[in-house]
Amino acid sequence: VLSAVLLATTGWSWYLGQVAEATVDRTDAIPGSGNEDSGGAAEAMNLLLVGSDSRADLTEEQLAELYAGTDSGLNTDTMILVHVPADGSAASFVSFPRDSYVQIPGHGEDKLNAAYAYGYAAVDSSLPETERQAGGAQLLVQTIHDLTGLQIDHYAEVDLLGFFELTSVVGGVEVNLCAAVDDREYSGAYFPAGPQTIAGADALKFVRQRHHYDNGLGDFNRIIRQQVFIAGVLRNMLSTDVLLDPGKQRELVEAAARSLTVDQDLDLFSLAAQMQSVTLDGITFQTVPMADPYAEDEQGRSIVRLEDEDTLHQFFAQLSAEPEAPEAPAAPPAPVDPSTVSVEVLNGSGISGLAASAQGELEAAGFTVTGTGNAD
């Protein structure tokens, strides 16, 4: 999505599109079944944007710098559905809490961020890693499809290293913290209060932090921070500093493409063309409707209970509804037949002969002149 925004705003987008296509990784993320057409406009697009906690490409030094630990990294801690209408006039981002308690096809109820891990584990371990990753992506796509009632057209995933590299190239995002943050025990976030620019490793800590000043709202505060940060990245990409700098454009496209793994059929150039009318005012951020954000499952784990299926499907149907076409302008009134109009010409100018001259022109145009004279 970020690379597409940049491609859509440049005069040499075809070239940048080729650069992105040559760099981006592909995965077979869209399942052949369990993701049926939801009947929306054919040209509209639903893209599942995923942030995984994969640490596969991180060195020990990077693990330490990013406070990433050494977990296996099969969870998807950030899941955002991006809807772009057929006319490309807007983009809606809907976040899903990672602890959303949902039906995962073939596995019953569990936290949403476990869907990828289930799909990954279901693929024979003797097969290539790329096939196991595709299995994880496909089950997550099926789960989101069932939740929303929408067909998921495309998939884009960024891991910890990719996010770190992208935010480093973007140059960071300006934030204004109401209070100092000290979450060094968990995410590593350690920021003073007040305005500051956050990039690279600090950016990753900022969007992953959920233990400090959360008042029990850790994951929801994290979602807000993620949405704020994405909006800031988009603002930077649409700034004149980028739009007027071809070198910066290429650098950002290369970083975005290196950071992403996308489905086999996502055409970045077509996506850019579809989003070329999107402005910051046309971008909205929401969170999926929740019934109980502080629930527990039978094992005593903290979970988020979402609204029922009908409510969720109605919410996403409204979200994906195409904007109504503006009403056609009223037809102009029928022209008046000049022969039906009677005119009396009175000369008030004081110049002799003007009334007679006007009479001749009006009669030539088809009007009926009932008389001429001088005005009082």
Predicted regions located by residue number:
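Non-catalytic, solvent-exposed segments at the cell envelope interface
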Residues: 1-376
